[in-house]
Amino acid sequence: MAKLGVIADGISQNFEYALDVMNEFELEYAELQFLWGKEVGDLNTAEVNKVQNLVNAHGVKVSCISRHIFGGLLVGEMQQDNSVYLEHLDALRRCIDMAKVLD
């Protein structure tokens, strides 16, 4: 059987409310993009810990951390000395770190 989930901010960027709705509809998996007005990868350590506590309390699993990384960059901008490229690379690292915490 297919796994049932939802992009959480499609319900609301208020993550607690989104989790309540997910529980109401028995949705087990949450894809995270925007929480509390921030894009994932921009959450601080306390906010990531709050996400972890909330998903555990609601019995939900995180299926995907989805950030708009490298979107809009031109091929010529994909260079290690390009500051915008490096910002996107840092965002990718933060998302990977968040995924490890939520695993």
Regions inferred by a protein language model and the residue ranges of each:
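N-terminal pre-domain/capping segments
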Residues: 1-101
